[in-house]
């Protein structure tokens, strides 16, 4: 059993790295923030040699931590209302040397200078960029990057796991039905369904 756990632990960075374009070596990161709103912008930090040192993403009105390394040379690319990234291209040598974002409104933003191995990714029809993951060399640069794609529903919210969303909604409907049936029973005073974990 211990052997299986050890193998699973050792394999997990490899599995994560398989979804990373560019270089799969370095320290893994995943940018969390989708729960704060839709992706609204990105800030790319560049080195004097124009490779990608680090970046931040903006979800709603909140900026994430810096992934990779800060520099005084950075460029912001802010999305307009109803605008989403639908394609990302890039290139890499030891570090990412360029990133190009294309939006559904036809805007294109390029950071760095394309050199080295080229890559391109898109979520397919009716998909947009939700967040990113990747590998970085601490203090040096971003080495590789991966992309999480999702849909937009009628309310403008991100949907990238429809099966779980439907299951959660079904459970909530069942709880509502149970509460209606038990309307004459004493309420315990807990309002668990309305509480959200803000951690």
Curated annotation (Swiss-Prot):
Native source species: Mus musculus
Primary gene name: Sbp
Residues with attached carbohydrate: 62
GO function term, MF aspect, one: carbohydrate binding
Keywords: Glycoprotein, Lectin, Signal
Disulfide bonds: none
Protein name per the record: Prostatic spermine-binding protein
InterPro entries: Jacalin-like_lectin_dom, Jacalin-like_lectin_dom_sf, PolyBind_ProtTraffic
One GO location term (cellular component): extracellular region
Signal peptide bounds: 1-18
Induction behaviour: By androgens.
Pfam families the UniProt entry points to: Jacalin (PF01419)
Ranges for region Disordered: 159-199
Similarity comment: To rat SBP.
Keyword Signal: yes
